[in-house]
Each structure stands twice: as structure tokens, then as C-alpha cells.
From Swiss-Prot:
Family named by the database record: Belongs to the cytochrome b family.
Protein's recorded name: Cytochrome bc1 complex cytochrome b subunit
Family annotation (InterPro entries): Cyt_b/b6_N (IPR005797), Cytb/b6-like_sf (IPR027387), Di-haem_cyt_TM (IPR016174)
Record's bilayer topology term: Multi-pass membrane protein
Organism: Corynebacterium glutamicum (strain ATCC 13032 / DSM 20300 / JCM 1318 / BCRC 11384 / CCUG 27702 / LMG 3730 / NBRC 12168 / NCIMB 10025 / NRRL B-2784 / 534)
Length: 539
């Protein structure tokens, strides 16, 4: 039975052909920034594949054993079975270290790509109506991704992961009234408890991945149903999408890009070492030291705990420690992230549906707020390693702490002001080109002796030869002659590849035309010289 016969039989029963044809003809934009979400998706797939392999050999038990494995420096040392099996994966399981490091690199790439993807969504206004739900799903995905990563690198029960868990325990216990109950719910007792790794393991390999899968599916379904956003441009409106069809071109590109991400992670895992737990030793509560930093996506929370002043609050019989304010700050940031689309809609009064994106320069307030938040995040991340910087650069740790505190107040305000002025300046630059044209670099002398630069109009001119100002449509404004097809041709090739065939053909035509013009000029000059010589001979 042929595939055509099978397809006809299915279509006669379920009438699937028209729906499938319509779906595989769906169009996706080709802008490079849309690949950021794909990186997160492919990283998550790598996480699932490598995580399944690691679960075959890992034992999350905190039961104490005497290590007698392949890493000789730790032989005879008492440790938990979790740490011992993590060492066995690294040194005795075939390909275990490679898979473990690939899993760790994929976790970093997963969270970081989601953060960068969220920045793209924010700065281009892709969260506006009707996509508020997808924005909320994205925020929840980032929070769950960070929690999943934190639980993942806490499972080996090495010294660094134990320090991170101790900090988390202190923050939870510091919550007034509910802190103790939440701590017992999460850790199963006082820290360290016999149940904490078992509970983290179940959450890490079952509960959170299942939620992530459901949210990713919902996220992609909404993108598919609501159509993709796109940047303004020629022929692009709020009611269409210009790009490539999902079959076959987009599908082929997606598979190829997924393989590139997989290969990049494999390369990182093969040539770089990350989370060398054998150098840290098993967790011991008495061995907390400097230089204990979490992964980069959680470093900002550690920085917040480091720069927070030691403000303790006493309410009756309750003592609220300083780390409580860190939890409050995290909660406020999450609430602001979730509600930002509605806050912006409230202040701007914009309740329309939007399928076209915005250039960041066109919304200076939002762009400035985003840069301000980004600077705040970067300063907290840098503060998370203030002890390392103090030791490496021989600076006082107290000075580094105060630099972080002052920077968190002054830095975002300065970033807001500079970004706002840059956006206004870029808007003026675009409108100047639309009004006067593109600078050609050609200097012309006026009858009065003044020199001016000749501009190439982007549109029609009036009766006096002056360009008629064009309206700004939200798309990128050309600033160079070769972007208009002048000044030879626009070059689209790169270091690793030639120009496209049409560009090369056009370049050859221009070169040939220039050669003919040069030959004609030389011929005319030669004829003029011959004629002049004849006239001089007659005289």
C-alpha cells in the first residue's frame, strides 16, 4: 500500500488534508532575533536527553558511605551516596563526564537564552495585546528554569552545592510566620535533612520538567495560533506575515540549527570543564568559604544577599533577619515582570492588537526602563562575586560591598538618562534622513562660495529640487548609499561565503559598463588629441 493510498484513507475518514495543508503553509519571519527562542527549545531537548542518561546512574541518597572509586584522592573519605555516585558518573561510567558536563552547559544555555529572548520580547513590544498570556508563560518558564537549574546543581551534595542550599535554607527560615513551615515542607526537617535530596530529585526529574513541558507546549501553541510578530517593513502589515513557509525551508533550517546547538554544547562539554565536583569534596557545614558562587543565572540573587545591609526587624517575638529583604526584593521583581504589560497598557492607553514590532528607539521610556533593569541585574551579578574581585584585585571587600550598594542606586538612574537621550538622538537621525536624504560624501560649492554636502533624496522632490519629507513608518531607515543600490552594489557576502549570485551578476554588469565607459572616454580623448595635432600641423 502506497503512502498516497494511506493518506487518502485517512483523509476520507478524518478530513485532515485541508487542515494539514493550511498548517504546513504557515509562514515564519526570518529575522535573526527569532532564533533566540529556538536556542532555548533545543537546549531543553538536550537537557531531557542527557538528564535521562544521568538518572540511570545517580542515587540521590544522603546515606553516608566510604568512597572507594576511581578518583584516588578521595578514597577512604566519608561522603553521601549522592556525591559518590556523581563521582562514579564522572570517572567510571563510559561517557559519564561528557554527558554530565553537556547537561550542565545545556542548563546554562537554556536559562541564558530564555533571558535574552525575554529581553528581545520586551524591547520590541512583542508582549503587547494580544500576547500578554505568552509573556506571563515566559516569565514563569524563566523562574522554573532557574529553580530547576538550582536544584540540579544541588543534587551532587558537594561543598559548593551544600553552601547554596544553606543560603536558600536561611532565606526561607527568615520569612516571618510561614518560614519554618515552608522550610519543613521543602527540606523535610532541619538543615541538612535526610529527605532534602530525595525531594529535590523528584522535583528536578519529574515535577518541574513536566510543568516546563506543558508550559513550553502552551507557549508554542499560542505563537502558532496568534501568528508570529514581525518587524515593520515593505509589504508588512498588522494582518500578514512575510517570511518563509514552515515546509520545507523553515523545517530544514530548524533541524540544522538544532544540530548546531547540539554540536556547540557537545564541543563545550568535550573541551571545557565545568562544575569539577571532585575538587570541592563532600559537603561539610563547617567548611563554608569565600569564592562560593552559584551558576551565572543565580549569581544576582547571591549578590542581593551580599549587598543587603544588616537590617533586622523585631516584631514582638519574631525576628526578621536581613536576608528576608532579599526574598521581598525577588518577589517584587517577579510581580513587576508578570504585570508589566498591563502596567504599560494602563499608562499608555494602548488597547489595540499589535502584530508589528517596535524599534527600541521608538519607545524611549520602555527602552530606558529595560536598560535600567538590565544594569540593576548586572550590578547584582557582579556583586555576587565581590569577594573574588576583592581578592584578585587587592581591594577591600567592604569597599566592594559599598560600591555595589551605591551602584545599585546611582547606576540604573544614569543608565535610564543616557538610554533615553540616545533613543531621542536616534529618532532625530532617522527623521533627518527622511527629510533631507542620505549623505553622499559629495561636496558642492554654492554660487556664494559656501560648501554643502549633496544629499540623495529617499523620495520625490519638489519643483525646486528639494526632497519632500517622508513619514516615518517604524522600519529601519537607510543611512548609506549602498543600502539604496547606489555606490556600486550592496554587499551581502561574508568572510566564509561569497556574495549571492544576483549580487555578483549585478557587480559584473556595473564593472562591464564602467569598462565600456572608460574605453569610450579614452577613445574620445584620443580622437580629440589626433584632431588637435592635425590642426596644429596645418597651422
Amino acid at each position: 500500500m502506497s503512502l498516497a493510498t494511506v493518506g487518502n484513507n485517512l483523509d476520507s475518514r478524518y478530513t485532515m488534508a485541508s487542515g494539514i495543508r493550511r498548517q504546513i503553509n504557515k509562514v515564519f519571519p526570518t529575522h535573526w532575533s527569532f532564533m533566540l527562542g529556538e536556542i532555548a527549545l533545543y537546549s531543553f531537548i538536550v537537557l531531557l536527553l542527557t538528564g535521562v542518561y544521568l538518572t540511570l546512574f545517580f542515587d540521590p541518597s544522603i546515606t553516608k558511605v566510604i568512597y572507594d572509586g576511581g578518583y584516588l584522592p578521595l578514597n577512604g573519605v566519608e561522603m553521601s551516596r549522592a556525591y559518590a555516585t556523581a563521582l562514579d558518573i564522572s570517572f567510571e561510567v563510559r561517557g559519564g563526564l561528557f554527558i554530565r558536563q553537556m547537561h550542565h552547559w545545556a542548563a546554562l544555555l537554556f536559562v541564558v537564552s530564555m533571558l535574552v529572548h525575554m529581553l528581545r520580547i520586551f524591547f520590541t513590544g512583542a508582549f503587547r495585546r494580544p500576547r500578554e498570556a505568552n509573556w506571563i508563560i515566559g516569565v514563569v518558564l524563566i523562574i522554573l528554569g532557574m529553580a530547576e537549574g538550582f536544584m540540579g546543581y544541588s543534587l551532587p551534595d558537594d561543598l559548593l552545592s551544600g553552601v547554596g542550599l544553606r543560603i536558600m535554607s536561611a532565606i526561607i527560615v527568615g520569612l516571618p510566620i510561614i518560614g519554618t513551615w515552608m522550610h519543613w515542607l521543602i527540606f523535610g526537617g532541619d538543615f541538612p535533612s535526610d529527605l532534602m535530596l530525595d525531594r529535590f530529585y523528584i522535583a528536578h526529574v519529574l515535577i518541574i520538567p513536566a510543568i516546563l513541558l506543558g508550559l513550553i507546549a502552551a507557549h508554542l501553541a499560542l505563537v502558532w495560533y496568534q501568528k508570529h510578530t514581525q518587524f515593520p517593513g515593505a509589504g508588512r502589515t498588522e494582518n500578514n506575515v512575510i517570511g518563509i513557509r514552515i515546509m520545507p525551508l523553515f523545517a530544514v533550517k530548524a533541524v540544522a540549527f538544532g544540530l548546531i546547538v547540539f554540536g556547540f554544547l557537545a564541543l563545550l562539554a568535550g573541551v571545557t570543564t565545568i562544575n569539577a565536583i571532585w575538587n570541592l569534596g563532600p559537603y561539610n557545614p563547617s567548611q563554608v568559604s569565600a569564592g562560593s558562587q552559584p551558576d551565572v543565572y543565580m549569581l544576582w540573587t547571591d549578590g542581593a544577599a551580599r549587598v543587603m545591609p544588616a537590617w533586622e526587624l523585631y516584631l514582638g517575638n519574631y525576628t526578621i533577619p536581613a536576608v528576608f529583604w532579599v526574598a521581598v526584593m525577588l518577589g517584587i521583581l517577579v510581580v513587576l515582570l508578570v504585570t508589566y504589560p498591563f502596567i504599560e497598557r494602563k499608562f499608555t492607553g494602548d488597547d489595540a492588537h499589535h502584530n508589528l514590532l517596535q524599534r527600541p528607539r521608538d519607545v524611549p521610556v520602555r527602552t530606558s526602563l529595560g536598560v535600567m533593569a538590565l544594569v540593576f541585574y548586572i550590578l547584582l551579578t557582579v556583586s555576587g562575586g565581590n569577594d573574588v574581585y576583592a581578592m584578585q584585585f587587592h581591594v577591600s571587600l567592604n569597599a566592594m560591598t559599598w560600591i555595589g550598594r551605591i551602584g545599585l542606586i546611582v547606576g540604573p538612574a544614569i543608565a535610564y538618562f543616557i538610554t533615553y537621550r540616545l533613543c531621542i538622538g536616534l529618532q532625530r537621525s532617522d527623521r533627518e534622513v527622511l527629510e533631507h536624504g542620505i549623505e553622499t560624501g559629495i561636496i558642492k560649492q554654492m554660487p556664494n562660495g559656501a560648501f554643502i554636502e549633496v544629499h540623495q533624496p529617499l523620495g520625490p522632490v519638489d519643483d525646486h529640487g528639494h526632497p519632500i519629507p517622508l513619514p516615518y513608518a517604524g522600519a529601519a531607515v537607510p543611512k548609506q548609499m549602498n543600502q539604496l543600490g547606489y555606490a556600486e552594489v550592496e554587499t551581502r557576502g561574508g568572510f566564509f561565503g561569497p556574495d549571492p549570485e544576483d549580487i555578483r551578476a549585478k557587480a559584473k554588469e556595473i564593472e562591464h559598463a564602467n569598462h565600456i565607459e572608460e574605453a569610450n572616454t579614452l577613445r574620445a580623448l584620443n580622437e580629440a588629441n589626433i584632431e588637435r595635432d592635425k590642426n596644429e600641423g596645418k597651422n
